[in-house]
Amino acid sequence: MRGFALALVIGSLAVTAVRWGSWVAGGSDSYCYVHQAERWADVFGHLARGRLTGLQLAEPLALDAPWPDAARAFAPSGHVPSPTVTGAIVPICPAGLSIAMAPFVLAGGPRAAFYVLPLFGAVLVAATSVVGSRFGARVGLLSSLLVAASPIVLYQVIQPMSDVPAAALWMLAVALATSAKPRSSLLSGLVTSAAILMRPNLVPLGITIGLFLLLRPERSWPQRLRSAATYAMASAPGCIVVALTQNAFYGSPFASGYGSLVALFSLSYVTANLGRYLGWLWSTHTAAIVLALLAPWLLPGGLTALALVMFLVNLALYLPYVVFDDWSYLRFLLPTIPLLLILVVAVVDAALRRFRVPGVAWITSAAVIVLSVLFVREARQRPTFALKRLEARFERAGIFVGDRLPPNALVITSSESGSVRFYAGRKTLLWDGLDPAWLDRALMYVRSKGYEPYLLFERREETDFRQRFPGSAIGRLDWPPMAEIAAQVRIYRPEDRDRYLHGTLPPTEFVP
């Protein structure tokens, strides 16, 4: 019966991920992961045929363009100019999720990459059930329900980002590390290796698991040392691959696509971030989340210590990080939020049993069901189930460009640069990467190379474009667009300005 119930919970989350999935390559993160998945798939495909190819391909226009810092203007959303291959681009995001997506791309094309999301969501729920079952089978099942209903899980499982995959891998690593089976330390280390590849900055979580294995009280010292050493060796490949990849992409094993550590981290951020993360945790998961703090008294032991220490380490890693104001950045704590939810269920169950309350199973189950309903309601009040509709503009605009613009179109855009490349296969140029004095000359340059320039904006970007290029007639953007898509995206043809001034411009095409 519990197996059927768990399958139902897993299936519900998977269906949610598919039904409401915002499976578009549009934003910075999503295009970063999906585009790199295409590159890794290309590398794997060539290797399977006994050939070698590189992850970085130089863009000829970036090599030849005459304006300052030209490479930056040809780096689409989610990418930066490569410091190691002139004229190429590199992702800002870690390689782990893209590598996981690559086999799906090989099997079913670029859009198949999105199917890793429900799979990782299923792994997250299943692993939570296993870890929770260390406190009892009932706790395992009920905690998996809470995780599947968590607002931040629901918000992230429908997006092509690494948060749910990272959480799934860390929970699976904990599930294996807390197992009594002979090869559990080895398997936990291998999963940790994958988790590090997915989110390299969370290496300290792996150290926490290693210390748990080293200090596990129910085992002898030889067993502890053997388990910890096995775990450490199995975790090492992920660290090595990260170092090699980052060295190839950014010129150093310790560099990343997000920028310098000095720019990203400061102790001055700690207070602001502490209030934000704890506040978001409370507002999304109700005051019940505080019950996890009672676990050391009601459920003393290694598993409780592991869960709380991992959460504190996860929190500490992000306290000095850049301050964000949107609740969705609670996703940074997603790898360990399931551990808190397990402790919440375990504390309720243990408290009822300690006070010998009749009907413990029914009361605990009812409490968790109520919490789950509150969680889902909270997720609905946030834009969780509207993301698919809100981000559909990326796909619609990209498809329009592919269907209606000529093959030699070069699209000057910014936030839509990834979607134009992914759905239309057209070259892009970032207007906010151009020197303000170079817009007109950039248009002349791309025409001289055989490309027809188009301008594509989200409506909110038009004012910024005008302000950036006040000295250019094209920069005024004072003629109607050739097309408006989903009432949010506009496409302009620079040549249409003269037609408009002479009264010969055809009307704007409105695309729903």
Q: What are these regions, as identified by a protein language model?
A:
Residues 2-4, 128-150, 167-168, 177, ...:
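Transmembrane-helix signature of polytopic, membrane-embedded enzymes
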Residues 370-419, 447, 511-512:
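Membrane-embedded, lumen/periplasm-facing catalytic core of multi-pass transferases
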